[in-house]
From Swiss-Prot:
Residues 245-263 have a biased composition (Pro residues). Disulfide bonds join 44-265, 187-235, 216-223. This is Penicillin-insensitive murein endopeptidase. Murein endopeptidase that cleaves the D-alanyl-meso-2,6-diamino-pimelyl amide bond that connects peptidoglycan strands. Likely plays a role in the removal of murein from the sacculus. It comes from Klebsiella pneumoniae subsp. pneumoniae (strain ATCC 700721 / MGH 78578). GO terms for molecular function: metal ion binding; metalloendopeptidase activity; serine-type endopeptidase activity.
Length: 274
């Protein structure tokens, strides 16, 4: 996992330097009623909407990458969440990657974000709106200590817990991925109101942002939902297992070959990519 802001920014920069995928050649949404197709890590979208690039409650980062498209449900979720944050005077929500105009596989940085139902949101809430140069080259705030087991106390705030909780309490949200150390801090902060913690899942990296995932929309018949998270708040043995050293003799997982596209997504590529 990355341990510094510099490393986080290097990861973002490297994603843009890799060879383009066919999906990046589709520069506008595919016309039609909104349909998320396939799985979050192997799919596409018809009828995506562009998130308006600025609103009173949020700003969109790295707009030059054109990753601000998603299912209308995702656009509406971002607007709901940012309105809540704005009305509470918590600051400005910083929106990172959503998806490309037709969804599909990125050239780097993400395995998912393919069906228009995922969004990355920075875990910082500036009181002063960022300038255009700050938005194009955002400074990620690494909240995780160098030991990987705790958050940095001077960087953590109750507002970050509240931001994640507001997102988790939205009925359209099924999962929120954060670093295990961030999940652990949320468990400590939560008090007796813990039902929302079930949706917050520990995952690699995610030291400066949360990755929010929505459920498959009712009208998207070819969309594949994940199984629900396990029962409970996820603050027990499962979470602690993330902090254990690797078992002797364990080897890193082998990178898998991407599976074939869903037929409907392959048909979109065949029709729209020369």
């Amino acid at each position: 996992m990355k341990n510094t802001v510099i490393a986080l920014l290097a990861l973002l920069a490297s994603a843009g330097s890799l060879a383009a995928t066919p999906w990046q050649k589709i520069t506008q949404p595919i016309g039609g009623s909104a349909q998320s197709i396939g799985a979050f890590s192997n799919g596409c979208i018809v009828g995506a909407e562009a998130l308006p690039l600025s609103a009173p409650g949020y700003q969109v980062m790295r707009t030059d990458q054109r990753r601000y498209f998603g299912h209308p449900d995702l656009v509406q979720f971002i607007q709901r969440l940012s309105n809540q944050v704005h009305n509470k005077g918590m600051g400005t929500v910083l929106i990172g990657d959503m998806g490309m105009p037709a969804g599909g596989r990125f050239n780097g940085g993400h395995a998912s974000h393919q069906t228009g139902l995922d969004v990355d949101i920075f875990l910082q809430l500036p009181q002063t709106r960022w300038t255009s140069s700050q938005l194009l080259k955002p400074q990620a705030l690494d909240l995780v200590a160098s030991d990987g087991k705790h958050v940095v106390p001077s960087l953590w705030s109750p507002q970050i817990s509240q931001l994640i909780k507001l997102a988790a309490e939205d009925s359209e949200v099924t999962r929120i991925f954060v670093n295990p150390a961030i999940k652990q801090q949320l468990c400590l902060d939560a008090g007796s109101d813990r039902q929302w913690l079930r949706k917050v899942r520990p995952w690699f990296q995610h030291r400066a942002h949360m990755h929010v995932r929505l459920r498959c929309p009712a009208g998207s018949l070819e969309c594949e939902d994940q199984a629900p998270p396990p029962p409970g708040d996820g603050c027990g043995a499962e979470l602690q297992s993330w902090f254990e050293p690797p078992k002797p003799g364990s080897t890193p997982p082998v990178k898998k070959t991407p599976p074939p596209l869903p037929p409907s997504c392959q048909a979109l590529l065949d029709e729209h990519v020369l």
